[in-house]
Amino acid sequence: MSVEQSLLGKETEYPTTYSPSVLFPISRDAAREKYAQIEGISQGKDWWHVFELSWLNSDNIPQVAIGRITLPATSPYLIESKSLKLYFNSLNFHVFASKQELIDLVEKDLSQAANAKVSLELFDVDSLEISKPSGMCIDDLKPERLESHPDASLLKLDANEQHDADVTLYSHLLRSNCPVTGQPDWGTVFIRYTGRKHCYRSILAYIISYRQHNGFHEQCVEQIYADIWKNLQPEKLMVYATYTRRGGLDINPCRVSDLSWMPNPIRLARQ
């Protein structure tokens, strides 16, 4: 099925009974074809936070929690976000004898949709703390050149620095558009690398160039990862984006060249 057949951007009735059939998988293959030779492009995880998660206990009393879904980047499919929202809404009036029963059912349904092992972790509503970003913020730098669409030629090494570096950079200025609805997506992107020192102004210019780009969160992160890997040739690389929520969900894709560089998932203030 193509994304045009999904419920994104369409008026939809919200199910009030358990409805796993609403889940809409989207193949990762088409977006990855041009990155087939990029090391690590399918290595990492997609973390989703579910803020509108509710069900009934055995006494028919509503329960609430925050959920964290972990979807491996190796999965053949990602799950379209509106369908995931509808799926979780369909659980609002479903009775579960325990939290574990809920977890087991959700993991089964999402794993089937993604054709890979998906996990769910539950948090009390006041226990998922907000973290502060770590690393060097590059948002106050002045780019030499600005473009309105992603342009890998913006990426440059630092001509004045020959020594290798192990650096984590981040920017709050990531913006792209949903490819179906055209709605803006906002995020913070973290870039960690080892190798020849990058020109940080060029990286900021490259991030800003996504502001009119149409792409799903996961696809944007993989394009950023691929362009840095190809153009700047780091020894190791991590790209991790924490997007703001929409419809009670936020999406946080991470791609790494080395699994030892997988960060712990975080929640930032804008989420």
UniProtKB/Swiss-Prot annotation:
Residues the entry annotates as binding NADPH: 81-82, 246-247
Molecular functions per Gene Ontology: preQ1 synthase activity
Annotated Gene3D superfamilies: 3.30.1130.10
Location (main, coarse): cytoplasm
Keyword Cytoplasm among UniProt keywords: yes
Keywords from the named record: Cytoplasm, NADP, Oxidoreductase, Queuosine biosynthesis
InterPro entries to which the protein is assigned, alphabetical: GTP-CH-I_C/QueF, NADPH_dep_7-cyano-7-deazaG_red, QueF, QueF_N, QueF_type2
Pfam families in UniProt: QueF, QueF_N
Catalyzed reaction equations: 7-aminomethyl-7-carbaguanine + 2 NADP(+) = 7-cyano-7-deazaguanine + 2 NADPH + 3 H(+)
Active site residues of this protein: 178 (thioimide intermediate), 185 (proton donor)
EC number: 1.7.1.13
Family: Belongs to the GTP cyclohydrolase I family. QueF type 2 subfamily.
Protein purpose: Catalyzes the NADPH-dependent reduction of 7-cyano-7-deazaguanine (preQ0) to 7-aminomethyl-7-deazaguanine (preQ1).
Annotated PANTHER family: NADPH-DEPENDENT 7-CYANO-7-DEAZAGUANINE REDUCTASE (PTHR34354:SF1)
NCBIfam families tied to this protein: QueF
Complex and partners: Homodimer.
HAMAP family listed in its UniProt record: QueF_type2
Protein name, per record: NADPH-dependent 7-cyano-7-deazaguanine reductase
